[in-house]
C-alpha cells in the first residue's frame, strides 16, 4: 500500500490547510516566544526552552522545514542564540544537544551551509556522552538516564545518524549501546520498584533504540540478547491476546491498560515491538504488534478517545502510530487512520490562538506552541497526512 493512498484527497488537503494555518501563527521566533509566554501563564510546569526540540525553537524549525515555508533557518538561528543564555550542557534528545543536532540535521538537507555547525554539534554531543557517568547499580537508575526522551535511548537514535562518524561519535555511541544493554538486563530500568513498559520512558523505547541501531549495523556484545529479553518481557507482561493484547503503564500496575497514547502503554509498546520485528525479520512478532495496535485503535473508535490532541499523550500521537503501522502493511491501522485524521482535523478551532490546546495530565489546558505536547507537533503530523509520506522527524518518536 502506498502512503499516498492512506487518506482520501479531500481529507489530506484539509489536514494540510490546518497545518499551514498553525505555521502562520508561529511564523517567527518572536511569535513563538509570545505564545510560550502566554502558555506559561496557563500551567504550573516550566516547559519552554529556546534550543529544545520538544518545547523550543529547534522543534519549530522542523515545523517550518516540513511546511515548505522558508522560516526554518530563522528558528535554527533562534535556537542557537538561546544557547548563549542557557547552554545545552546535557545530551538528551528532546531537551538537549541531541535534539538540536536532530533539528539542524533535518534543516541541513535543504540548507547545506549548516553542515559545519552540525559537525561541531555532533562532536559536542559525543563529548557530553563520554563525560556522562550513568549509574550501573540496580535501584540507582532514573528514567532520564536511559529513556528515549532524555536518556541514552534517544541519544542513540541521533548518534546512529551522525555523519561523519568520528572517533568521538563512535565512542559515544558505543557507550550508549552498552549502557542500554545493561539497563535492559534483569529489569535494571526499574524506578522506585516499577518497570515502565512504554515508548517515552520504558522498555519499548529501549527496545526501539537498540533495534534501530541493530538495523543500521551498529552493534555491541549482548545487544541481540537484550532485544530478545525486552521482547520476551513485554510479551509476558501484556494482558490478553490477539486484538485484546494490551499493556499497563508500569509493572507492577496500579490499574488496567494505560490511556491510549504514543508515550505510555499499548500504543508505544506495539511500536517498539514493530521496530524489533523489522530489525530482526520476525514476522510473527510483527503480526502481534499489528494486532495489539489494531485492538487499541478499535477501543479508541468505540469511544476511548484521548482528551488532548497532541503528539505525546493525545490524538496526534495515535495518528502517527496508525500511519506508521498502515504504511508497513497493517490493514487495521489503514482502516482506522481516516477516522482518526478526520477527528484531529475537525478538532481544530481557528478561534483559539494555535487552533489546538494541550490537555495536560495535571488538568491544565494550555495553548502550547511546542512539538511534543503542543501545536507544532500537531501541525507536523497534519503535514505528514497531507503529503502522504513518512517524514524524517518521526524518527524521534519511532526509531528505525
Features from the language model and the residues they span:
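Terminal, non-catalytic domain-edge segments
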Residues: 1-29, 212, 275, 324-335, ...
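Well-ordered alpha-helical scaffold segments within catalytic/enzyme domains
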Residues: 1-9, 58-69, 100-113, 154-166, ...
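Residue-level recognition of alpha-helical structural elements
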Residues: 11, 49, 72, 89, ...
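Long, well-ordered core segments of solenoidal/helical folds
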Residues: 14-43, 68-87, 117-139, 172-189, ...
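Solvent-exposed loop and edge beta-strand segments that line ligand/cofactor-binding
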Residues: 35-58, 81-97, 137-151, 189-204, ...
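Internal, well-ordered domain-core segments that constitute the primary functional module
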Residues: 104-175
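An internal, amphipathic alpha-helical element
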Residues: 155, 270, 304-328, 346-353, ...
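Extended ligand-binding clefts on enzyme/binding-domain cores
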Residues: 167-280
Amino acid at each position: 500500500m502506498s502512503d499516498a493512498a492512506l487518506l482520501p484527497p479531500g481529507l489530506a488537503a484539509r489536514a494540510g490547510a490546518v497545518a499551514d494555518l498553525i505555521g502562520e501563527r508561529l511564523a517567527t521566533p518572536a511569535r513563538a516566544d509570545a505564545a510560550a509566554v502566554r502558555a506559561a501563564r496557563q500551567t504550573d510546569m516550566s516547559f519552554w526552552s529556546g534550543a529544545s526540540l520538544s518545547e523550543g525553537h529547534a522543534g519549530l524549525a522542523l515545523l517550518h522545514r516540513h511546511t515548505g515555508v522558508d522560516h526554518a533557518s530563522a528558528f535554527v538561528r533562534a535556537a542557537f542564540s538561546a544557547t548563549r543564555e542557557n547552554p545545552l550542557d546535557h545530551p538528551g534528545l528532546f531537551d538537549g544537544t541531541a535534539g538540536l543536532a536532530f533539528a539542524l540535521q533535518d534543516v541541513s538537507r535543504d540548507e547545506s551551509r549548516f553542515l559545519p555547525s552540525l559537525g561541531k554539534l555532533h562532536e559536542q554531543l559525543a563529548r557530553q556522552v563520554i563525560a556522562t557517568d550513568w549509574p550501573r547499580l540496580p535501584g540507582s537508575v532514573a528514567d532520564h538516564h536511559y529513556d528515549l526522551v532524555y536518556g541514552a535511548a534517544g541519544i542513540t537514535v541521533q548518534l546512529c545518524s551522525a555523519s561523519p562518524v568520528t572517533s568521538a561519535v563512535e565512542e559515544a555511541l558505543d557507550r550508549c549501546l552498552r549502557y542500554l544493554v545493561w539497563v535492559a538486563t534483569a529489569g535494571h530500568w526499574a524506578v522506585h520498584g516499577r518497570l515502565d513498559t512504554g515508548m517515552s520512558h520504558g522498555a519499548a523505547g529501549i527496545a526501539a533504540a537498540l533495534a534501530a541501531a541493530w538495523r543500521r549495523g551498529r552493534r555491541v556484545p549482548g545487544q541481540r540478547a537484550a532485544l530478545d529479553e525486552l521482547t520476551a518481557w513485554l510479551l509476558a507482561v501484556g494482558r490478553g491476546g490477539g486484538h485484546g493484547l494490551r499493556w499497563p503503564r508500569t509493572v507492577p500496575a496500579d490499574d488496567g491498560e494505560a490511556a491510549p497514547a504514543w508515550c505510555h502503554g499499548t500504543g508505544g509498546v506495539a511500536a517498539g515491538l514493530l521496530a524489533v520485528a523489522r530489525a530482526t525479520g520476525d514476522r510473527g512478532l510483527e503480526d502481534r504488534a499489528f494486532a495489539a495496535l489494531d485492538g487499541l485503535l478499535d477501543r479508541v473508535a468505540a469511544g476511548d478517545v484521548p482528551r488532548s490532541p497532541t503528539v505525546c499523550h493525545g490524538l496526534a500521537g495515535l495518528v502517527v502510530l496508525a500511519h506508521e503501522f498502515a504504511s508497513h502493511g497493517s490493514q487495521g491501522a489503514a482502516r482506522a487512520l481516516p477516522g482518526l485524521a478526520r477527528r484531529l482535523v475537525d478538532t481544530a478551532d481557528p478561534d483559539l490562538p494555535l487552533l489546538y490546546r494541550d490537555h495536560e495530565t495535571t488538568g491544565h489546558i494550555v495553548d502550547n506552541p511546542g512539538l511534543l505536547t503542543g501545536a507544532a507537533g500537531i501541525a507536523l503530523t497534519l503535514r505528514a497526512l497531507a503529503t502522504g509520506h513518512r517524514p524524517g522527524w518521526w524518527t524521534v518518536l519511532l526509531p528505525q
